[in-house]
From Swiss-Prot:
The keyword Glycoprotein appears for this protein: no
GO BP terms in the entry: response to ethylene; response to hydrogen peroxide; response to jasmonic acid; response to metal ion; response to molecule of fungal origin; response to nitric oxide; response to salicylic acid; response to vanadate(3-)
Name recorded for this polypeptide: Squalene monooxygenase SE1
Any one Gene Ontology cellular component term annotated for this protein: endoplasmic reticulum membrane
Cell location: Microsome membrane; Endoplasmic reticulum membrane
Function: Component of the triterpene saponins (e.g. ginsenosides or panaxosides) and phytosterols biosynthetic pathways. Catalyzes the first oxygenation step in sterol biosynthesis and is suggested to be one of the rate-limiting enzymes in this pathway.
Family as reported in the entry's similarity comment: Belongs to the squalene monooxygenase family.
Major location category of this protein: membrane
Length: 539
């Protein structure tokens, strides 16, 4: 009986083990899947919680923004646009260790007729950013000053470069070649992602910019996120309206030509012809090419397709061109490769927005007559770099926004000097039927021809080597007073006195509206603006 009972127990145990093994075989795979699924849910919940608590960065899942490629934390700064400002900024921030995602509409070499002359002050900023080698290997030409022509007279204004290294000078080049060099240098850094795509909008949540939505070159719609988005998408920016109050003016248009295989009368100098109705510019952009820019007042130029523009260039402009350049100018017109573009000006009027910043032509423009745009942009980038350097974490967008308000005041000495000079010089250099304006134009040419401080002071301002608004103000009214003095000496008749008074009033009418748009306090007394003293936030 004991033997029978033992056998029964053994059989029962054996049956139980067989049943258990069968159950394990049937459900083992399901248990594994259940365990993995639960683990992944727990991990995802933990990550979301950490992200919400530590960075306050993200958007609702219902919007479709979270994908494995753009979970917050993989990028520190998004840069929209990779022109001069965007590519220089990308290299600068990445060189400081930031993870940078650049989204540019077109990464092929651009072909523009402006952004081709970098002033010495801008070249110094290029050195400061470690980008000076980007003017090498593109056939860039050194520029040492300007030659000024008016009514058969000419004078030469040289940059005051005596105190600088021999390499410091202006540079003129093909804009596209220069930009490509900077893009390549930025993209060579491992923490820069350079992508071709069109940014369609900023992603905002609770008043803060969290990133951008964009279309890739294949048409795929994606989103990218970062604690700071910097918009540098140029003069045609479609994003600036939410970040500033854009008051764009178009005082004139440029007509661009290229003269080939000829030298300028004054080697290594830009040439400005004070023509009627407005200035003409010449400068070398390669060893064999001279860029000619003809300013046409107003928002429209004569029609190209019916030959009206070519006729205008031959009959109105060509007779005012220096005789050494006349034949090459006519040949360039006949060749037919005529380009046009509107000249825009827009004072900086930002809406400080947490998580976002505007830079470059998207933020601030001035008439390109003085070639100061790249100098302003590079100077702004140096400031942004210095302001961001002490910060390890950019996620506190409100605090960062308040801190970066200092940028708008700190940039004023350079930006307002170059902006004001560009706007004022353009108005003075244009021909006018008004007798007082004519006297101001003649006085300006003769004042610059005096030499010494009368030429070195203004050219130091224009070059970005001496960005002092008070110096600009004093030289501008010195020109006006010089013009009045010429009218009153030797015989101050009532007619001449009245003309002198009109000259002063006209000069005031030119410069004071520009100063007002730049901001009187920020321009001349930045130290009394509270934002000037903003300290880096302590984390």
């Amino acid at each position: 009986m004991n033997s029978s009972s033992s056998t029964t127990t053994t059989d029962t145990l054996h049956s139980f083990m067989e049943a258990s093994a069968l159950l394990i075989d049937q459900y083992f795979l399901g248990w594994i899947f259940a365990f993995l699924f639960g683990f992944l849910l727990l991990l995802n919940f933990k990550r979301k919680r950490e992200k919400n608590n530590s960075t306050e960065f993200g958007t609702d899942d219902s919007n479709g923004y979270y994908t494995p490629e753009n979970i917050a934390g993989s990028t520190d700064v998004i840069i929209v646009g990779a022109g001069v400002a965007g590519s220089a900024l990308a290299y600068t921030l990445a060189n400081d260790g930031r993870r940078v995602h650049v989204i540019e509409r077109d990464l092929t070499e651009q072909d523009r007729i402006v952004g081709e002359l970098l002033q010495p002050g801008g070249y110094l900023k290029l050195i400061e950013l470690g980008l000076e080698d980007c003017v090498n290997e593109i056939d860039a030409q050194r520029v040492f000053g300007y030659a000024l022509y008016m009514d058969g007279k000419n004078t030469r204004l040289s940059y005051p470069l005596e105190k600088f290294h021999s390499d410091v000078a202006g540079r003129s080049f093909h804009n596209g070649r220069f930009v490509q060099r900077m893009r390549e240098k930025a993209a060579s850094l491992p923490n820069v992602r350079m992508e071709q795509g069109t940014v369609t909008s900023l992603v905002e949540k609770k008043g803060s910019v969290k990133g951008v939505q964009y279309k890739t070159k294949d048409g795929q719609e994606l989103s990218a996120f970062a604690p700071l988005t910097i918009v540098c998408d140029g003069c045609f920016s479609n994003l600036r309206r939410s970040l500033c109050n854009p008051k764009v003016e178009v005082p004139s248009c440029f007509v661009g030509l290229i003269l080939e295989n000829i030298d300028l009368p004054h080697i290594n100098h830009g040439h400005v012809i004070l023509a009627d109705p407005s200035p003409i510019l010449f400068y070398k952009i390669s060893s064999t090419e001279i860029r000619c820019l003809v300013d046409v007042p107003g928002q429209k130029v004569p029609c190209i397709s019916n030959g009206e523009l070519a006729n205008y260039l031959k009959t109105v402009v060509a007779p005012q061109v220096p005789k050494q350049l006349y034949n090459s100018f006519i040949a360039a017109v006949d060749k037919g490769n005529i380009r046009t573009m509107p000249n825009r000006s827009m004072p900086a009027d930002p809406h400080p927005t947490p998580g976002a910043l505007l830079l470059g032509d998207a933020f601030n423009m001035r008439h390109p007559l003085t070639g100061g745009g790249m100098t302003v942009a590079l100077s702004d980038i140096v400031l942004i770099r210095d302001l961001l350097r002490p910060l390890r974490d950019l996620h506190d967008s409100s605090t960062l926004c308040k801190y970066l308000e200092s940028f708008y005041t700190l940039r004023k000495p350079v930006a307002s000097t170059i902006n004001t000079l560009a706007g004022a010089l353009y108005k003075v250099f244009c021909a006018s039927p008004d007798k007082a304006r004519q006297e101001m134009r003649n006085a300006c040419f003769d004042y610059l021809s005096l030499g010494g401080i009368c030429s070195q002071g203004p050219i130091a301002l224009l070059s970005g080597l001496n960005p002092r608004p008070i110096s600009l103000f004093l030289h501008f009214f010195a020109v006006a007073i010089y013009g009045v003095g010429r009218l009153l000496i030797p015989f101050p008749s009532p007619k001449r006195m009245w003309l002198g008074a009109r000259l002063i009033l006209g000069a005031s009418g030119i410069i004071f509206p520009i100063i007002k748009s730049e901001g009187l306090r920020q321009m001349f007394f930045p130290a009394i603006v509270p934002a000037y003293y903003r300290a880096p936030p302590i984390h």
